[in-house]
Structure formats: structure tokens, C-alpha cells
């Protein structure tokens, strides 16, 4: 025992300064890249591009750049070109090195700190250039400034050679070229053109008049897009409403500046029942909203009510319209430019500056009041839409109260057809929404009763894209789902109260099954989106074929692009000697017994499930409206354009 204590004492004495590791320069970034770019997966890889593009956008925000070009090179490296002033090349006092070298080799170096470089910056932390350098096998920068072309190259963050002049020029700007390091990005170093193009288009909308393009030079993937919107966020609203019926043609656009904070709002009403409000702060999409949205919402509600009362559209003794009423069918984009944005929330995408509430409120109120006075016909349409929404809300409230009395939107009154699980651990619990009573019966028998619950639904549920709130709440199947999930509804919705953290849609592998799946996804997207954003929603992948030898099923074939190849391979595999394999086609879940359903579709050890995510809310909104909304023409166009890829289930 004494010997052990002596040994312990010796170990303690050895813990001295020599044991402390100091990470020099950009070594810390390479050691812990996730701290700087979020992850080393696909999202983090694309974040490298945004760090460099954001620097060019900063030049545009400051009024010095008008054209940005992004290239995915043939070798999958990235080049970003802008026509700004060019990164400074003179000696930086603190480091004694050229400023451009400092920007790419020293963390927190750049024109974004201290207010001397940029009035407003798109960057969250100003470490972008050096982080990209640290996480690239090679990076080079060309600065076009003062009639000269300055060039410097780096490898994994380290300087290869001093800054040099390699030519003359009559233009200004900066060109950055980098190759992501596969030692860091072990999952993939392949850039996704569509991911880059969507964000680049968004930046073009948010920066009126800016020209920004993306070009893919990779073999077999060559494509190019140019974005330029003189209408700015007004054009963005038109883009979002492209497939919708609008109640007035030209979006309302307002802009203003107060206390150094610039506010832009564009909005337009549609005939739909859904609200689409997107907000941005310094070009960063604030998915979680924030103080700019608060100010906008409060002003919108107050101004519409004031106008309605003053013009006798609403009587003095009538209740005011609520925020929910005046936002029904609204599509709006809010963009603020703030010299010192504060971001908070779970994903740091919520604007927290308290002063922005009153500034947005005041600037938007003044402009919106003026618009309503100058456009009385449009103003009346807006108010009347709000009044209709109010009537539907009151009817929905009555329906909700009746529903609570009859079957309850309360957890204590779970729907009768729900076969619940015994576990109370939401983290492991799974709710399967199953098409039809027959399959529901098999699923109930075959499941693991400890953590798997079954909710059968009959037929096609209501298309919520075309329905008012009172009709939605009157639908028994929809009510059952909300009650089973335990999350509440509407303003009371709380994803933290979800009783299951896997919500699995399990429908037949035919056209009807696909339709039911789409209806359920529409419902979840419109009224349970936090469940979707939390990653709780899955689609079961039941087999489409079973390969039998005699009476025994040897292999199941899952649906997918290569399903016919899988089937062909399986048939060849089991065509041995005299045995002749046969194919069983599963059109419905009810064609499988409980054991088969468990083995192929529900057993966590064997099953395949597709998780449903929302990477692009604006695009998702447009697609749901096109597929499920009132307008037939966009849906017909989509079917005609994509029919060649469809499989008919006859």
C-alpha cells in the first residue's frame, strides 16, 4: 500500500510545465476543426466556401464589390473571385508581416474587428480565411491592387513563400483558391453543386444588384448559373410565391435605417392558409427568428388593426385580429444589417439584439402605414383575408374545445386505436403510423411492445394544404396523431413533450401508399415542423420483393433505384441445380404476416429507414405548395417534366 502511494506521488510530481501542450497558430484549428466550422462532414466542407464568399460579400455590403464568381474546379478545388478593393498588402503593424498573410495565418485577424474595416459584416466571428487555410492542403491568394498582382501560397496553413508581385493589372479584387484537406474531411471532399447554388442565389436576393455566379468545371458535371436581382428581397418573395395564387401582384417593399441599423422587408399575401416568414441578419439565415421578427410581427398586427378600425372594416366593438390572423397566407422576407449582431439560440441562428425590436417595428410601421393609405384596394384585401382567418380561428377553437371534451387533446386520453408501448423513455420510443387496419394488426402483433407503438390510419387523411384550421381539427386521423405524439397543437405545440423521438411513416409500396405518405409529410411539415427539424421523422422501407425457393423466402429486395438489379442478382444466386426461385411481389403491408413485417421493416437490427430532413425550408415550402396546393398548372407541369422517371404500379 505504501509503495502504491509513493508511485502515485511520483506521478504527481512529473506533472509539470513540460506536460502542457501549447498549440501554435493554426494548429488548434487542425486539432479541433469542429469548433470552427461545426463539423468535418458535408456541412463543414461547404462552410469553407461560405467563409471565403462571406469576405467578398463584406466588400459588397461596404459598397466596394459588385461581382463575385465561385468555381468548382475540375479537381474539386474551389476558386472565389471578387472585384472589391483587394485585401491590404502593406505591412500589418502588430505582426510585422503583410496584411494579406496575417489574414490567412492568424486567427481573429481581418477587417471585421474594431469597426475600422467594415461598418457591417456578414461573418459571425471573423476567423474565416485563416480557418480555411488551416483546413486546406493548399491555398493561394491573388490580390489585384495598386496596379499590381500580389501572390502568396500556403500549405495546411503554413506559408510556402513570401508575398510576391507576379504582374501588373488595371483592375482591383481578390482571388482565393483552396483544396480541402482529406485528412480533415474524411467523410467527403466532394462539393455539392446544388447546395452551393442555392445559397449563392439566396445571397444574390439579399444583396440587391450584386452579380454572383457559380460554375462547375468537373468532368461530366459541367454547369453554370448567374444570379442578379435588382428587386432584391422583393424578387425573393416573388420567387417563393412563384407557384402560388397571390391576392395582389407586386410585393410590398420597405427599407430604412435608424441608429446605424438597416432594415428591409418585402411581403405579399397569397390565397393559401400557410405562413412563410424568412428572416436574415447580415445575410445569415436566422432560422430561429429573433428580435427583427418580433418587431415585424408586432408592427404588422398593430398597423392592420389600426387601419381596419379607422376605416370601419372592423367595428369598434369587434375583437382585434390576432397575429396568427394577419399572417395567414403571408410570405415575407426580413433582412437587417447590424454593425454588431448578437446571435443566440440552440444553433446560434437567432438574432438577440434587443434594440432591433423597436427599430424594426418603427421603420416597418411607418412604411406599411403609408403603403396601406396609398393603396386602399390592396389594404382592404389584406384586412378581409385577416377577418376570414379570424373566423376560421374561432371555429377551430370551438372544434378544439369540443375535441378536448370528446376525446381530449390530452395525453391522459390517448386515442383508442393507438397500441402504445410500455416504456416511458421518449428517447427510445417509436410511433409507427401504419396504413390500413390489416397492416396495423400485423404491426401490432409483430412489434416490440416495450418501445414500439402502432397508430393505424384509415384511407387518405385530409390534405391540410387546402384546409382551414377548423376542418383540420375536426379530422379524426389528424387529431389522433397529435394526441398520440403529446406535443400539443398550434400555439401550444412543444416538441420537448414528444412521447416518441421516432415517428415512422409505414405505408404500402404502391401509388396510394405514396399519396398517403405525402399527405402525412405535408401535415408534419405545416403543423409539426419542430418534430421534423429535430430529426424525429422517418419513412419505413418495407421490401418490394421476396425471392422464394420452395416455400422459404431466401432474400428480401428493398425499394430503390437499383431494385431490379438486386432482384436479378438474387435470382441468379438461388438458381442452383434444380431449384427455381420465384418472386413474391409485396404491394401492400397486409400481404406480410407479423413475423415478416417485424423481420423486414420494424426490427432495429435489420430494417432500413429513411430520415426526413429539411435542408432548404424555402425550397420545401415551394414544393409542398406545388404538389398539394390549389393550383393545377404547376403540378401538371411538374408531372410532365418528371414523368419519364415515374414508375406506374399497374
Curated annotation (Swiss-Prot):
Cofactor: Mg(2+); Mn(2+); Ca(2+)
GO terms under cellular component: chromosome; cytoplasm
GO biological process, one term: DNA topological change
Top-level lineage group: Bacteria
CC cofactor note: Binds two Mg(2+) per subunit. The magnesium ions form salt bridges with both the protein and the DNA. Can also accept other divalent metal cations, such as Mn(2+) or Ca(2+).
Predominant subcellular localization, coarse grouping: cytoplasm
Positions of Mg(2+) 2 binding: 508, 510
Coiled-coil boundaries: none
Gene Ontology terms for molecular function: ATP binding; DNA binding; DNA negative supercoiling activity; metal ion binding
Residues reported to bind Mg(2+) 1: 435, 508
Keywords recorded for this protein, A-Z: ATP-binding, Cytoplasm, DNA-binding, Isomerase, Magnesium, Metal-binding, Nucleotide-binding, Topoisomerase
Residue stretches making up the Toprim domain: 429-543
Catalysed reaction equations from the record: ATP-dependent breakage, passage and rejoining of double-stranded DNA
HAMAP family from the UniProt entry: GyrB (MF_01898)
Family: Belongs to the type II topoisomerase GyrB family.
Note: Few gyrases are as efficient as E.coli at forming negative supercoils. Not all organisms have 2 type II topoisomerases; in organisms with a single type II topoisomerase this enzyme also has to decatenate newly replicated chromosomes.
Function: A type II topoisomerase that negatively supercoils closed circular double-stranded (ds) DNA in an ATP-dependent manner to modulate DNA topology and maintain chromosomes in an underwound state. Negative supercoiling favors strand separation, and DNA replication, transcription, recombination and repair, all of which involve strand separation. Also able to catalyze the interconversion of other topological isomers of dsDNA rings, including catenanes and knotted rings. Type II topoisomerases break and join 2 DNA strands simultaneously in an ATP-dependent manner.
Official protein name in the record: DNA gyrase subunit B
Organism for this UniProt entry: Streptococcus pyogenes serotype M6 (strain ATCC BAA-946 / MGAS10394)
Gene this protein is translated from: gyrB
Amino acid at each position: 500500500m505504501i509503495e502504491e502511494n509513493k508511485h502515485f506521488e511520483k506521478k504527481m510530481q512529473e506533472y509539470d510545465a513540460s506536460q502542457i501542450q501549447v498549440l501554435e497558430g493554426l494548429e488548434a484549428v487542425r486539432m479541433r476543426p469542429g469548433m470552427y466550422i461545426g463539423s468535418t462532414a458535408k456541412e463543414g466542407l461547404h462552410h469553407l466556401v461560405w467563409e471565403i464568399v462571406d469576405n467578398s460579400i463584406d466588400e459588397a455590403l461596404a459598397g466596394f464589390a459588385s461581382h463575385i464568381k465561385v468555381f468548382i474546379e475540375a479537381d474539386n478545388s474551389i476558386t472565389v473571385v471578387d472585384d472589391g478593393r483587394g485585401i491590404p498588402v502593406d505591412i500589418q503593424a502588430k505582426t510585422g508581416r503583410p496584411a494579406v498573410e496575417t489574414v490567412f495565418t492568424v486567427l481573429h485577424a481581418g477587417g471585421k474587428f474594431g469597426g475600422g474595416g467594415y461598418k457591417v459584416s456578414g461573418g459571425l466571428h471573423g476567423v474565416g480565411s485563416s480557418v480555411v487555410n488551416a483546413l486546406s492542403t493548399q491555398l493561394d491568394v491573388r490580390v489585384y491592387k495598386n496596379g499590381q498582382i500580389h501572390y502568396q501560397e500556403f500549405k495546411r496553413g503554413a506559408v510556402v513563400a513570401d508575398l510576391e508581385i507576379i504582374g501588373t493589372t488595371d483592375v482591383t479584387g481578390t482571388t482565393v483558391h483552396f483544396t480541402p484537406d482529406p485528412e480533415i474531411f474524411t467523410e467527403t471532399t466532394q462539393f455539392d453543386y446544388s447546395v452551393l447554388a442555392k445559397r449563392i442565389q439566396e445571397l444574390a436576393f439579399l444583396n440587391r444588384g450584386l452579380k454572383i455566379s457559380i460554375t462547375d468545371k468537373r468532368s461530366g458535371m459541367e454547369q453554370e448559373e448567374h444570379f442578379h436581382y435588382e428587386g432584391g428581397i422583393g424578387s425573393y418573395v416573388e420567387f417563393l410565391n412563384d407557384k402560388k395564387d397571390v391576392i395582389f401582384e407586386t410585393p410590398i417593399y420597405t427599407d430604412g435605417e435608424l441608429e446605424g441599423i438597416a432594415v428591409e422587408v418585402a411581403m405579399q399575401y397569397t390565397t393559401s392558409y400557410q405562413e412563410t416568414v424568412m428572416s436574415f441578419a447580415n445575410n445569415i439565415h436566422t432560422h430561429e427568428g429573433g428580435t427583427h421578427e418580433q418587431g415585424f410581427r408586432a408592427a404588422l398586427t398593430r398597423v392592420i388593426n389600426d387601419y381596419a378600425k379607422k376605416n370601419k372594416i372592423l367595428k369598434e366593438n369587434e375583437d382585434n385580429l390576432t397575429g396568427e390572423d394577419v399572417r395567414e397566407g403571408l410570405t415575407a422576407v426580413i433582412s437587417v444589417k447590424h454593425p454588431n449582431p448578437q446571435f443566440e439560440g440552440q444553433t446560434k441562428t437567432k438574432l438577440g439584439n434587443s434594440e432591433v425590436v423597436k427599430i424594426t417595428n418603427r421603420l416597418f410601421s411607418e412604411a406599411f402605414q403609408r403603403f396601406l393609405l396609398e393603396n386602399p384596394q390592396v389594404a382592404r384585401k389584406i384586412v378581409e383575408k385577416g377577418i376570414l382567418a379570424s373566423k376560421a380561428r374561432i371555429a377551430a377553437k370551438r372544434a378544439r374545445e369540443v375535441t378536448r371534451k370528446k376525446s381530449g387533446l390530452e395525453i391522459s386520453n390517448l386515442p383508442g386505436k393507438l397500441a402504445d408501448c410500455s416504456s416511458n423513455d421518449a428517447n427510445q420510443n417509436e410511433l409507427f403510423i401504419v396504413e390500413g387496419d390489416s397492416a396495423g394488426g400485423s404491426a401490432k402483433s409483430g412489434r416490440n411492445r416495450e418501445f414500439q407503438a402502432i397508430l393505424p390510419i384509415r384511407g387518405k387523411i385530409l390534405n391540410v394544404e387546402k384546409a382551414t384550421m377548423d376542418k383540420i381539427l375536426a379530422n379524426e386521423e389528424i387529431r389522433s396523431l397529435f394526441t398520440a405524439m403529446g406535443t400539443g397543437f398550434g400555439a401550444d405545440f412543444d416538441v420537448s413533450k414528444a412521447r416518441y423521438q421516432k415517428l415512422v411513416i409505414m405505408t404500402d409500396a404502391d401509388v396510394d401508399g405514396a399519396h398517403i405518405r405525402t399527405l402525412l409529410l405535408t401535415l408534419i411539415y405545416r403543423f409539426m415542423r419542430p418534430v421534423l427539424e429535430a430529426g424525429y421523422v422517418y419513412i419505413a422501407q418495407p421490401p418490394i420483393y421476396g425471392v422464394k425457393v420452395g416455400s422459404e423466402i431466401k432474400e428480401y429486395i428493398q425499394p430503390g433505384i437499383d431494385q431490379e438489379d438486386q432482384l436479378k442478382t438474387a435470382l441468379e444466386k438461388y438458381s442452383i441445380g434444380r431449384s427455381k426461385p420465384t418472386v413474391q411481389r409485396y404491394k401492400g403491408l397486409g400481404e406480410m404476416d407479423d413475423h415478416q413485417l417485424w423481420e423486414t421493416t420494424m426490427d432495429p437490427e435489420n430494417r432500413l429507414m429513411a430520415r426526413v430532413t429539411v435542408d432548404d425550408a424555402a425550397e420545401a415550402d415551394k414544393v409542398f405548395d406545388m404538389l398539394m396546393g390549389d393550383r393545377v398548372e404547376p403540378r401538371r407541369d411538374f408531372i410532365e417534366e418528371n414523368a419519364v422517371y415515374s414508375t406506374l404500379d399497374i
